[in-house]
């Protein structure tokens, strides 16, 4: 015999289900649950008088060796490039073990995940679960960035630097074996996955190759070191040999050539372009056109995202500080002015919304904010919905990111747009850096870097941040209170952020060459070590929901951007969601 229950009551008890919609924070973005892998009437819930008790929802006989998970997140709504759906999520040995229906198969049919005596429970009812964010544009200037990033939902930081040296304040470079090794040793202290870029500036192969063998997972070419065609070619030659990435900040002043010369130097090889719009640096005024190429993996940094009435004014001062410029030197001021163009900045939001720009990142403390990658990504999505309307792919059947037919919810939902935007800071940067087999999505077998959100605070303040299956940061109240919730509730480090747990729940990414050379053993690294791989065969077509390659042009006099001949622009925002009302206290 079956029973019916009102949807509102069901959502209060077990969380929303198929067809229900959830508003994300205070935006106009609405998520619709596409499917529910739990079983109606057999939902598992923890608590007094609830289901997960010995002999009921928990199997009292199975040992951990019988595939019992370490943790189950119950009834969570998963928001991922792979789908938007509800499920129980099992974690084991620091990885996502299974996604499906949890419970006790001795009394319940359809159980994929057996809850046992070894299992901890995290209540995912009425919560949204995403993969941890991946920021591929980190200037390692201050160690405090790590906690700031973690508390925003970012669990992987890739970039370069040595601390507050002038080279690091301007460029994401950890130059040479000695600095690379010291930074790898420093990374042992942090509950964060970390990978380093070496300096991609040499006129011979060996000065670059030795940095890859020392542990760098890529090379950074930056105009402040000279973004010459020779440096570009040499870096890509080494990258092809060692299967690592090259990230590039091109030549704003066009001293070493124009954008066409850079394109010729790249010569069809895959490359990860930073702040591709150009305000963060790059050929003035038309570096943005490179985003339409099939071998280019284009990213934005967050200071220009989204375009607001304050964007232009704040950028000039930021640029002068970050790139060691002197406001008393006219040429330095002209250099700064050439990078800040309202027309190309206005086009950037639209190119993100069209899936032409594929990745968002921070440019931490070097014209970007390390704790705002996720927030600003969703602010762009909201701004674009308000200015451009609902995407054609939303509200019915359309082609998915892989070219196959897939449903993206009913009218009134934004599922396609949500998949496009969540991919920008999860799976796509993972693909670009060769770590997508380890992190970047909520899929079985992936490392359990996960973020749990209250929908009202989605994209702004996480509820829990899990690193390698253990809670590393959480929204926590007064430690002297009688319960966990009294004010002040702030994001605080949890047990996963301390002691030797850090080494078992966080990853240092290295090149295969460094691993083969015994760098982890030489340096005494205790963190989990994973290689980067599969980079040199990438194309933009591999990026999820953000693989468009149109013809992009920039008028050299007006800076107006066109995509396939159509003008592309948007108005600056006066008001944004996910902003001051969330940070009053």
Swiss-Prot record:
<feature type="binding site">
    <location>
        <position position="137"/>
    </location>
    <ligand>
        <name>Ni(2+) 1</name>
    </ligand>
</feature>
<keyword id="KW-0378">Hydrolase</keyword>
<keyword id="KW-0963">Cytoplasm</keyword>
<comment type="subunit">
    <text>Heterotrimer of UreA (gamma), UreB (beta) and UreC (alpha) subunits. Three heterotrimers associate to form the active enzyme.</text>
</comment>
<dbReference type="Pfam" id="PF00449">
    <property type="entry name" value="Urease_alpha"/>
</dbReference>
<feature type="binding site" description="via carbamate group">
    <location>
        <position position="220"/>
    </location>
    <ligand>
        <name>Ni(2+) 1</name>
    </ligand>
</feature>
<dbReference type="InterPro" id="IPR032466">
    <property type="entry name" value="Metal_Hydrolase"/>
</dbReference>
<dbReference type="InterPro" id="IPR011612">
    <property type="entry name" value="Urease_alpha_N_dom"/>
</dbReference>
<dbReference type="InterPro" id="IPR017951">
    <property type="entry name" value="Urease_asu_c"/>
</dbReference>
<comment type="pathway">
    <text>Nitrogen metabolism; urea degradation; CO(2) and NH(3) from urea (urease route): step 1/1.</text>
</comment>
<keyword id="KW-0479">Metal-binding</keyword>
<dbReference type="InterPro" id="IPR050112">
    <property type="entry name" value="Urease_alpha_subunit"/>
</dbReference>
<comment type="similarity">
    <text>Belongs to the metallo-dependent hydrolases superfamily. Urease alpha subunit family.</text>
</comment>
<dbReference type="GO" id="GO:0016151">
    <property type="term" value="F:nickel cation binding"/>
</dbReference>
<feature type="binding site" description="via carbamate group">
    <location>
        <position position="220"/>
    </location>
    <ligand>
        <name>Ni(2+) 2</name>
    </ligand>
</feature>
<feature type="binding site">
    <location>
        <position position="363"/>
    </location>
    <ligand>
        <name>Ni(2+) 1</name>
    </ligand>
</feature>
<dbReference type="GO" id="GO:0005737">
    <property type="term" value="C:cytoplasm"/>
</dbReference>
<dbReference type="InterPro" id="IPR029754">
    <property type="entry name" value="Urease_Ni-bd"/>
</dbReference>
<keyword id="KW-0533">Nickel</keyword>
<feature type="binding site">
    <location>
        <position position="139"/>
    </location>
    <ligand>
        <name>Ni(2+) 1</name>
    </ligand>
</feature>
<dbReference type="InterPro" id="IPR005848">
    <property type="entry name" value="Urease_asu"/>
</dbReference>
<dbReference type="InterPro" id="IPR017950">
    <property type="entry name" value="Urease_AS"/>
</dbReference>
<feature type="active site" description="Proton donor">
    <location>
        <position position="323"/>
    </location>
</feature>
<dbReference type="InterPro" id="IPR006680">
    <property type="entry name" value="Amidohydro-rel"/>
</dbReference>
<feature type="binding site">
    <location>
        <position position="222"/>
    </location>
    <ligand>
        <name>substrate</name>
    </ligand>
</feature>
<dbReference type="GO" id="GO:0009039">
    <property type="term" value="F:urease activity"/>
</dbReference>
<feature type="binding site">
    <location>
        <position position="249"/>
    </location>
    <ligand>
        <name>Ni(2+) 2</name>
    </ligand>
</feature>
<protein>
    <recommendedName>
        <fullName>Urease subunit alpha</fullName>
        <ecNumber>3.5.1.5</ecNumber>
    </recommendedName>
</protein>
<feature type="binding site">
    <location>
        <position position="275"/>
    </location>
    <ligand>
        <name>Ni(2+) 2</name>
    </ligand>
</feature>
<dbReference type="InterPro" id="IPR011059">
    <property type="entry name" value="Metal-dep_hydrolase_composite"/>
</dbReference>
<dbReference type="GO" id="GO:0043419">
    <property type="term" value="P:urea catabolic process"/>
</dbReference>
<dbReference type="Pfam" id="PF01979">
    <property type="entry name" value="Amidohydro_1"/>
</dbReference>
<feature type="domain" description="Urease">
    <location>
        <begin position="132"/>
        <end position="585"/>
    </location>
</feature>
<feature type="modified residue" description="N6-carboxylysine">
    <location>
        <position position="220"/>
    </location>
</feature>
